[in-house]
């Protein structure tokens, strides 16, 4: 599904959230059933951004991210940082979409799993090389525990030559699972904001998904049984 931009560059808030939820389901990115997560924990739903595999899907995905970033952070940023590996196509697709929708050129950057020690683009980063004065938005698919930011944050700050030289404007993810992070009573995104001091936002929350597919839906995707599991 391709977005139909308004004069301001995107859809109204509720419309784009509803369409994004349908887009995730149609793309087989968001699934409901009985899943075992990497942590070993059971979950009634599973999200895999690696299922976005076609050009049209990535083109559309970039537009949803671009609007969410614009709505949450405005134009107060220069760089999209997508942690390797899944964050790389997210950063690329969104930088393209942001230029198209809002007329602002945004650079993309990612980290390398292994630092390159030769060539003109050697170093720990892929794409644009972040430096002092840059304003960065971190872009990821989803965060369950907030552990990924523990790796990403120091990699970005390591590029500074003066303390505070690089500003992290915020983080954006596809879905806020709204689950407690570890032993905390807060969600992973709330924990990130509290610990690092920048806002962590999502295109949609799990509550948005439930409202669209269960409360307002026909319960064919989120059944009564799955809803009960989500509520546990």
Model region roles, listed by residue range:
Residues 14-22, 158-232:
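PRPP-dependent phosphoribosyltransferase catalytic core
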Residues 66-77, 157-163:
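Phosphate/pyrophosphate-binding loops at sites that engage ATP/ADP/AMP, CoA/4′-phosphopantetheine
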Residues 12-73:
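Active-site-facing substrate-recognition patch
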Residues 125-170, 176:
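A contiguous pocket-lining binding segment that forms or flanks enzyme active sites
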Residues 1-12:
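Short, Lys/Arg-enriched N-terminal segments with co-localized hydrophobic residues
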Residues 38, 127-131, 193-194:
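Solvent-exposed alpha-helices and their adjacent loops that cap or buttress functional pockets
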Residues 90-136, 147-151:
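Short, glycine/charge-rich flexible loops or terminal/linker lids adjacent to PRPP-binding catalytic cores
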Residues 75-86:
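Short glycine-rich phosphate-binding loop at a beta-alpha junction
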């Amino acid at each position: 599904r391709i977005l139909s931009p308004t004069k301001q560059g995107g859809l109204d808030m509720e419309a784009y959230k509803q369409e994004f939820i349908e887009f995730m389901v149609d793309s087989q990115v968001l699934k409901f059933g009985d899943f075992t997560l990497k942590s070993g924990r059971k979950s009634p739903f599973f999200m895999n951004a690696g299922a976005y595999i076609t050009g049209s899907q990535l083109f559309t995905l970039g537009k949803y991210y671009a609007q969410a970033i614009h709505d949450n952070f405005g134009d107060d940023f220069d760089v999209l940082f997508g942690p390797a590996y899944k964050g790389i196509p997210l950063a690329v697709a969104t930088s393209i979409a942001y230029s198209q929708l809002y007329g602002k050129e945004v650079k993309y950057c990612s980290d390398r799993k292994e630092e390159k020690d030769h060539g003109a683009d050697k170093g720990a980063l892929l794409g644009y090389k972040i430096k002092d004065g840059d304003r960065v938005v971190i872009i990821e698919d989803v965060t369950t525990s907030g552990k990924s930011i523990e790796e990403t944050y120091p990699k970005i700050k390591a590029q500074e030559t003066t303390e505070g030289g690089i500003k992290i404007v915020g983080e954006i993810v596809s879905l806020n699972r709204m689950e407690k992070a570890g032993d905390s009573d807060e969600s992973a995104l709330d924990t990130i904001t509290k610990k690092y001091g920048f806002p962590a936002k999502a295109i949609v929350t799990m509550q948005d998904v439930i409202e669209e597919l269960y409360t307002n839906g026909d319960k064919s995707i989120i059944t009564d049984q799955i809803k009960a599991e989500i509520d546990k």
